[in-house]
């Protein structure tokens, strides 16, 4: 039976206090959000414009635009009925035992004469262990062991790459490609010139006509390596083109298997739109299939056993956190705002998909809160609010005082108070982690965000289509990447002194790229529906205005090229050598970008959350993996 078809049980008490301080318990608004939204009587809603958009008469007698978004998919009663046996101490004890056994495996392959060590493939063993624990989502337990392994591999790295073992003189493509990727992601300096030697006289990667599993795996690792290229690395661009074509052809010829499923997954999600938890779930399923076919070695079997236990332990925590998110949403009065998209479960799925560290509940819970308000503001500025109302709300946020509600229409008052209290609450939480007041950062980000939205609302009301440059400059901010990232990361157990924050927040290159990628990718997925709602300005329409005679297809091709270029630039911003701003300080902001990108893989996965996004919720949050 599908998990979605289960009849919800009686609501259970929130278990939030069992894993986080009671001071963080979600609480209801002091004043529930006003029910002045759409009239609940069906006869009061008069459709017009198009199937994807309509106008409706609100309770205050104003004809308003609405988006006709589908309703919340996840009833609170259903969420409160979720239960999992994997929170029991016996599973934690089992995980600790397995962690010790995996550490022992790491130690044995690090011994010069260890029983598992062969000088013929020791480098590949180290790299495979690191790659496996990371893909299986259990690497947090083995940071010391990972560094020892990578230091060892790097000591044998040369300008010609490496072979599978330290005694192998000739480099091979598989080990070199895997090593390049893993080493670069961990901050080691490696150059793509190592791949030049694998080219034939025609300048193409040399490979035999026979598509053996070993050769296919080598090209798969080459493809994975090509995804973390920097903008100027021509050889990596060539490697990506070649490996993409090779793997697509291989899928047409090899039988359906765990290898074909792995190839399809990597081709589909690449790296910048991949969610770590979805990758973990997928890789667990692939290894489970190999285990059934008795093709796993002893080391990988042990890793798989630990990964399944860890996945399900975190799954239990996810469900507890999700209950609190749903309770907060319900008690806040948000369900009465019938003109907005209710996507709190989807936001939680995103954030728990990029951070599986159990102790970071505060980060995950508050990310959902911020994104929930982003959605309210998005729908308010895009459709429901009148221009006069939106100007009043924007001015009230600049005042940042509860008394500012006096000048607001009734339905905005509750939104403003809840936004005010939540942003202040998150700033107090951030103070505990950062040891300084960060409220001004948050307020400035919010003001900039609403300013960009007010400008877009003005464009909608007047039918104005700006130049592409003007549109994108504003769209970097209205994409909401900055506001969704800034306050949540400040609640992590990671220090963000001013010199580090300025490399991630506005106006840094990192922030600029992440915001523009999200805006460009979002528009390619949303522009047709937005246009049907009367929102003419998009990166597609602006490009076509700037380039008379161009077609939508040409505009999309140009924009997709811009996205790919910016992705490589963002790779550099994340991975560039910088002793003052380590990769670890930028990783969460980068992963938020990956998560947001993921939801636009096939469509606007927030607005239309009843297809791929629904399946993602089930696969990564609601269902455990079979033990």
From Swiss-Prot:
Q: Pinpoint motif DDXXD motif by residue range.
A: 378-382
What keywords appear on the UniProt entry?
Chloroplast, Lyase, Magnesium, Metal-binding, Plastid, Transit peptide
Give me the residues that bind Mg(2+) 2, please. Answer: 378, 382
Mention one GO molecular function. Answer: terpene synthase activity
* Transit peptide: first to last position: 1-46
Chief location:
plastid
Enzyme class, spelled out: lyase
Cofactor binding, per record: Binds 3 Mg(2+) or Mn(2+) ions per subunit.
Binding-site residues for Mg(2+) 1, renumbered to this chain = 378, 382
Reactions it catalyzes: (2E)-geranyl diphosphate = (+)-car-3-ene + diphosphate
Q: Which GO terms describe its cellular component?
A: chloroplast
Enzyme Commission identifier(s): 4.2.3.107
Residues recorded as binding Mg(2+) 3, renumbered to this chain, are 530
GO term, biological process aspect, one: diterpenoid biosynthetic process
Domain topic, free-text comment = The Asp-Asp-Xaa-Xaa-Asp/Glu (DDXXD/E) motif is important for the catalytic activity, presumably through binding to Mg(2+).
UniProt similarity note: Belongs to the terpene synthase family. Tpsd subfamily.
Q: What is this protein called?
A: (+)-3-carene synthase 1, chloroplastic
Q: Whose protein is this, by species?
A: Picea engelmannii x Picea glauca (Hybrid white spruce)
